[in-house]
From Swiss-Prot:
Subunit structure, as described in the record: Component of the ping-pong piRNA processing (4P) complex consisting of krimp, aub and AGO3. Interacts (via N-terminus when not methylated on arginine residues) with krimp (via non-canonical tudor domain); this interaction leads to symmetrical dimethylation on AGO3 arginine residues and its subsequent dissociation from krimp. Krimp associated AGO3 is mostly free of piRNA binding and the interaction plays an important role in the loading of AGO3 with piRNAs; piRNA binding may stimulate dissociation of the two proteins. May form part of a piRNA processing complex consisting of tud, aub and AGO3.
Tissue-specific expression: In ovary, expressed in germline stem cells, germline cyst cells, nurse cells and oocytes during early stages. Also found in the somatic cap cells of the germarium. In testis, expressed in germline stem cells, primary gonial cells and early spermatocytes. No expression detected in the somatic hub cells at the apical tip of the testis (at protein level). Expressed in neurons throughout the adult brain and in the mushroom body subdivision in the peduncle. In the mushroom body, expressed only in gamma and core alpha-beta neurons.
EC annotation from Swiss-Prot or TrEMBL: 3.1.26.-
Organism, scientific name: Drosophila melanogaster (Fruit fly)
GO biological process: oogenesis; piRNA processing; piRNA-mediated gene silencing by mRNA destabilization; regulatory ncRNA-mediated gene silencing; secondary piRNA processing; spermatogenesis; transposable element silencing by piRNA-mediated mRNA destabilization
PROSITE patterns given in the database record: PAZ, PIWI
Protein name per the record: Protein argonaute-3
Function: Component of the perinuclear meiotic nuage, a germline-specific subcellular membraneless ribonucleoprotein compartment involved in production of transposable element-repressing Piwi-interacting RNA (piRNA)-induced silencing complexes (piRISCs), which are essential for maintaining germline integrity during oogenesis. Acts via the Piwi-interacting RNA (piRNA) metabolic process, which mediates the repression of transposable elements during meiosis by forming complexes composed of piRNAs and Piwi proteins and governs the methylation and subsequent repression of transposons.
Effect of inactivating the gene: Female sterility. Male semi-sterility accompanied by production of Ste protein crystals in primary spermatocytes. Mutant males fail to maintain germline stem cells.
Region feature (Interaction with papi): 1-289
Annotated keywords: Cytoplasm, Developmental protein, Differentiation, Hydrolase, Methylation, Oogenesis, RNA-binding, RNA-mediated gene silencing, Spermatogenesis
UniProt key word Transport: no
Location in the cell: Cytoplasm; Cytoplasm, Perinuclear region; Cytoplasm, Cytoplasmic ribonucleoprotein granule
Length: 867
């Protein structure tokens, strides 16, 4: 254990303050929502700060029989007694060593898989009071969720009929139930193990047998509890969009843009270390006040020839709302060969859409020549028996939801929208209290919860957290404190970079009328380079007469030589097709670092200096240089990041990006991307990328790493089993038994919010705040980390799930390392929300998936060419 303790001490300024790293312990309701092998000078500087790397080697001798962190996930509502797809383990029950204390907490094999019976907490850092957006749920011991199997004699295939006949006896079942056609859930225990009812079905006597199976454990009931809260929100007259609920009675109007913002909530019930709780966060939905028909008319007037193609491109895949029933539908297609006068079948015969809407909704269709919107929905019931329900909707009755591309690109409009959607910590707490009051003061909502023995309390959202120490940032010759704000932008542009690559052979391509902008760029670059320690020579200037894409392509092909280090393109404006064409040439056809600059950013005399400073920093990274680092006292450890990109249209390829550190200061990265032919999050080709990265690490360092830490982004809770059983073994096959792996899933899209301060005045926690108790999952090794400073709105923490910790680092080291890595993203002189390796993987995957759409030349793999 001494090796681990010595390593941990290097993370703290004062080793004498060390402690244990693991503790064993019409609607009127107000919503309340108004490449260089040599060691750089920066690395030598780290060595001079008493980094006793020889102590770290003792980590290699700390072993545990089974890898830590193999979390047993929460079963779904219909989990069988015997779970499938158990976590991989090579040891039997008898061979598992039981630890009684220390970081290698007890791990045992049970009938439900491998899990951690001990609570895994860190202890380093100063204690802080934290508030969270969780409400405690208590259960009535006299009630519960009782599982029954229902059989019909003679058998009935139709789920609809099964539900109908069982409903004939609902008064005998207590009036409250959940039934999917096979399994019945009741909040009461029936007096007999088997209960038999008789129903009449077309002169045939139908026997219904209800057989008691078991009382469900709390962790198996969370799906039901979430269904109950969906019913509660419906009682409160909220409209459901996906998993979120919105209040249509209090929209915030943006008249000039013809938009309205609906306030709402997103709720989720789960079992946490603090018990059964409801996570409740504020949410908003943007709704267009223009109908889809108005949008179609605009498109037709803009381009008659390509009208249908443009309409499908803009609308297919979007979600629309029909206000006559407040339901949402996804647009799967537009039927230009049909209109509202077309006939379709209903129970009473055939009717037209015009007649149907007049009869059932009292709506007069005005335009009888408009096309129809085609939508598909899955029917409810047993998944295996669900059918596709097809709908044809009327465009003049449909309203687009969400943010369109033209809205996102309008900065002024986005700032106006943010005035409604950017919610402060105090406002979130007020909204949480208002939600509790609305549920508590609505008898129908209380009846839904009470019938299942549930009650909501509002006294459990104060928890404890920890604040990590302030980090030191290391440049080539000096180190500076990042401060509590974890920002150091002034120091980043006034100190020599950690590793400098001088620029002597390079090209600037610009339009002829942007000659002055190119000259201004060069002059400001030379000024910026003086303080950054970078020498820059005059470039070859290439003037273009036209802004056509082929002009840039020809200029690149004609002027790039073997000695060219970098090419800079100054473009008239931002165009995705031009940008993609330039990147395809420079990343695949003629591999060379490239920088694309919008000429408008060079024409503001007040901002040009800061803009060019950032450009120089980017260019140094793309050339293979590094900007700064932090002290990470590991020896012979490789850190990796993984993320993926999916085509939003769901029809294109997917890209999986893999990034791995290749030097001891974690300032140089090997990057590789795999283009996949079908949409999948769990990547098949990771092992090949991993193997190449190991070879590159050995080439740079003379040996393979002893330990590997992998941060995996883009994985939800539902994919953790698959990740553990399918993705991690790919790395193990490459490593064998020689290298230990710690595998950490990084989750950004979460609804957890944490606040600091008193109950009266709440604010965002400072960077470095970690929470690993109370609101973490009951059966996972996980924690929440706030790494960014957010001055407007509410900060969103990042959720880390440790699936494996075979390196035996324990929670304190993993938490501290995760925070340190957030300082190393070179596009921002401060902390980012996730570790830099994941940010680099995200940038790489996005560039290839969005623009390049092909493999990148291996010559660029050791440079951050995608920044």
């Amino acid at each position: 254990m001494s090796g681990r303790g010595n390593l941990l001490s290097l993370f703290n300024k004062n080793a004498g303050n060390m402690g244990k790293s693991i503790s064993s312990k019409d609607h009127e309701i107000d919503s309340g929502l108004d490449f260089n092998n040599s060691e750089s000078s920066g690395e030598r500087l780290l060595s001079s700060h008493n980094i006793e790397t020889d102590l770290i080697t003792t980590l290699q001798h700390v072993n545990i029989s089974v890898g830590r962190g193999r979390a047993r996930l929460i079963d779904t509502l219909k989990t069988d007694d015997h779970t499938s797809n158990q976590f991989i383990t090579s040891e039997s029950k008898e061979n598992i060593t039981k630890k009684t204390k220390g970081p290698e907490s007890e791990a045992i094999a049970s009938e439900n898989g491998l899990f951690f019976p001990d609570l895994i907490y860190g202890s380093k850092g100063s204690s802080v009071n934290i508030y969270c957006n969780y409400l405690k749920l208590t259960t009535d011991e006299s009630k519960g969720v009782f599982n029954y199997e229902v059989r019909f004699f003679p058998p009935i295939d139709s789920v609809h009929l099964r539900i109908k006949y069982l409903n004939d006896h609902k008064d005998k079942l207590g009036g409250t139930k959940t039934f999917d056609g096979n399994t019945l859930y009741l909040p009461i225990l029936l007096p007999n193990k088997m209960t038999v009812f008789i129903s009449k079905a077309e002169d045939v006597e139908l026997q219904i047998r209800i057989l008691y199976k078991k009382k469900e454990e709390m962790r198996n009931c969370t799906q039901l509890y979430n269904i109950l809260f969906d019913r509660v929100m419906k009682v409160l007259n909220y409209v459901k969009f996906d998993r979120k609920q919105f209040d249509p009675s209090r929209p915030k109007i943006i008249p000039l843009a013809k938009l309205e913002v609906w306030p709402g909530y997103v709720t989720a019930v789960d079992e946490y270390k603090g018990g059964l709780m409801l996570c409740c966060d504020v949410s908003h939905r943007i709704l267009c006040q223009k109908t889809v028909l108005e949008m179609l008319v605009d498109l037709y007037q803009q381009n008659v020839e390509h009208y249908q193609e443009s309409a499908r491109k803009m609308l297919v895949g979007n979600i629309v709302l029909t206000r006559y029933n407040n339901r949402t539908y996804k647009i799967n297609d537009i039927c230009f060969d049909q209109n509202p006068t077309c006939q379709f079948e209903i129970k009473t015969g055939c009717t037209s859409y015009v007649e149907y809407y007049k009869q059932y909704h009292n709506i007069n269709i005005k335009d009888v020549n408009q096309p129809l919107i085609y939508s598909i929905k899955k029917s409810r019931g047993i998944p295996a028996e669900r059918e596709n329900l097809q709908f044809c909707l009327i465009p003049e009755l449909c309203y687009l939801t969400g943010l369109r591309d033209e809205v996102r690109s309008d900065n002024k409009l986005m700032r106006e929208i943010a005035t409604f959607t950017r919610v402060s910590p105090n406002q979130r707490q007020m909204a949480l209290n208002k939600f509790y009051e609305n549920v508590s003061n609505t008898p129908a909502a209380q009846e839904i919860l009470n019938s299942w023995g549930l009650s909501l309390t509002n006294n459990s959202n104060k928890i404890s957290g920890r604040q990590m120490d302030i980090e030191q940032i290391y440049f080539s010759k000096i180190s500076v404190s990042a401060g509590r704000s974890a920002e150091f932008s002034k120091h980043a542009v006034t100190n020599e970079m950690l590793k400098v690559v001088h620029l002597s052979k390079w090209i600037i391509i610009h339009l002829r009328n942007y000659r002055q902008a190119a000259t201004s760029l060069l002059d400001n670059m030379k000024q910026a380079c003086e303080s950054l320690g970078m020498n820059i020579s005059n470039p070859t200037m290439i003037s273009l007469d036209h802004d056509r894409i082929d002009a840039y392509i020809q200029a690149l092909r004609r002027n790039i030589t073997m000695n060219t280090q970098m090419v800079v393109c100054i473009c008239h404006n931002r165009r995705d097709d031009r940008y993609a064409a330039i990147k395809k040439i420079c990343c695949s056809e003629i591999p060379i670092p490239s920088q694309v600059i919008n000429a408008k950013t060079l024409q503001n005399d007040l901002k040009i200096r800061s803009v060019v400073q950032k450009i120089v920093l980017q260019m140094n990274c793309k050339l293979g240089g590094s900007l700064w680092t932090v002290k990470i006292p590991f020896k012979n450890v490789m850190i990796c990041g993984i993320d993926s990109y999916h085509d939003p249209s769901n029809r294109g390829n997917s890209v999986a990006a893999f990034v791995a550190s290749i030097n001891s200061s974690y300032s140089q990265w090997y990057s590789k991307a795999v283009v996949q032919t079908k949409r999948e999050e769990i990547v098949n080709g990771l092992s090949a990328s991993f193997e190449i990265a190991l070879k590159m690490y050995r080439k740079r360092n003379g040996k393979l790493p002893t330990n590997i830490i992998i941060y995996r982004d883009g994985i939800g809770d539902g994919q953790l089993y698959t990740c553990l059983n399918y993705e991690i073994p790919q790395f193990e096959m490459v490593c064998g038994n020689r290298i230990k792996i710690s595998y950490i899933v990084v989750q950004k899209r979460i609804n957890t919010r944490i606040f600091s301060g008193s109950g009266i005045h709440l604010e965002n926690p400072l960077p470095g705040t970690v929470v690993d108790q109370h609101i973490t999952k009951s059966n996972m090794y996980d924690f929440f980390l706030v790494s960014q400073l957010v001055r407007q709105g509410t900060v969103t923490p990042t959720h880390y799930v440790v699936l494996r910790d075979d390196c035996n680092y324990g929670p304190d080291i993993i938490q501290k390392l995760s925070y340190k890595l957030c300082f190393l993203y070179y596009n921002w002189a401060g902390t980012v929300r996730i570790p830099a390796c994941c940010m680099y993987a995200h940038k790489l995957a996005y560039l290839i998936g969005q623009s390049i759409q092909r493999d990148v030349a291996e010559a660029l793999s050791e440079k951050l060419f995608y920044l």
